[in-house]
Swiss-Prot record:
<comment type="function">
    <text>Destroys superoxide anion radicals which are normally produced within the cells and which are toxic to biological systems.</text>
</comment>
<dbReference type="GO" id="GO:0046872">
    <property type="term" value="F:metal ion binding"/>
</dbReference>
<keyword id="KW-0560">Oxidoreductase</keyword>
<feature type="binding site">
    <location>
        <position position="164"/>
    </location>
    <ligand>
        <name>Fe cation</name>
    </ligand>
</feature>
<feature type="binding site">
    <location>
        <position position="160"/>
    </location>
    <ligand>
        <name>Fe cation</name>
    </ligand>
</feature>
<dbReference type="InterPro" id="IPR019832">
    <property type="entry name" value="Mn/Fe_SOD_C"/>
</dbReference>
<comment type="subunit">
    <text>Homotetramer.</text>
</comment>
<dbReference type="Pfam" id="PF00081">
    <property type="entry name" value="Sod_Fe_N"/>
</dbReference>
<dbReference type="InterPro" id="IPR019831">
    <property type="entry name" value="Mn/Fe_SOD_N"/>
</dbReference>
<dbReference type="InterPro" id="IPR001189">
    <property type="entry name" value="Mn/Fe_SOD"/>
</dbReference>
<keyword id="KW-0964">Secreted</keyword>
<dbReference type="InterPro" id="IPR036324">
    <property type="entry name" value="Mn/Fe_SOD_N_sf"/>
</dbReference>
<dbReference type="GO" id="GO:0004784">
    <property type="term" value="F:superoxide dismutase activity"/>
</dbReference>
<dbReference type="InterPro" id="IPR036314">
    <property type="entry name" value="SOD_C_sf"/>
</dbReference>
<keyword id="KW-0408">Iron</keyword>
<feature type="binding site">
    <location>
        <position position="28"/>
    </location>
    <ligand>
        <name>Fe cation</name>
    </ligand>
</feature>
<dbReference type="InterPro" id="IPR050265">
    <property type="entry name" value="Fe/Mn_Superoxide_Dismutase"/>
</dbReference>
Amino acid sequence: MAEYTLPDLDWDYGALEPHISGQINELHHSKHHATYVKGANDAVAKLEEARAKEDHSAILLNEKNLAFNLAGHVNHTIWWKNLSPNGGDKPTGELAAAIADAFGSFDKFRAQFHAAATTVQGSGWAALGWDTLGNKLLIFQVYDHQTNFPLGIVPLLLLDMWEHAFYLQYKNVKVDFAKAFWNVVNWADVQSRYAAATSQTKGLTFG
């Protein structure tokens, strides 16, 4: 069975400065993200052992651990792709039109996304996703890595609001981190995810 692996980044750790420091990116990627990858692989191995023993309590525990760590791995993998030293500005084309249609304007979308990010209680994410059932863009606050994000939503743009993503640079002023994020958003990546979600996920939920 193939194991989960830590992806390489498309840019050097310091490439997003001054908006996100190289120190943060190095720790975030090589330590925190790596921990979720290891946690997911460990949970899979323990889940196999528990199934072999028909230990249902252990099965449920390791399914829970797998959900947390695998979601952490998936979210961070998208996070790194959502960022670019050549990012910033605004989306264009079909994504820009869809954002304007769903939220009224890019500025209104940005305000709602910013509010979702900066009011997360505890650890979590802000997420822009494509609703494969309702065929529309939606914003969610994600608690931890996986809670409050409905099945059938394809993530397009994520903002990591765990303290490990910003504290070394921004301390407790997470609002400033959420503002700086817009300077490094890789809209080309978000557009690519939007195009794939809208063209390849029809019928994903109900067939």
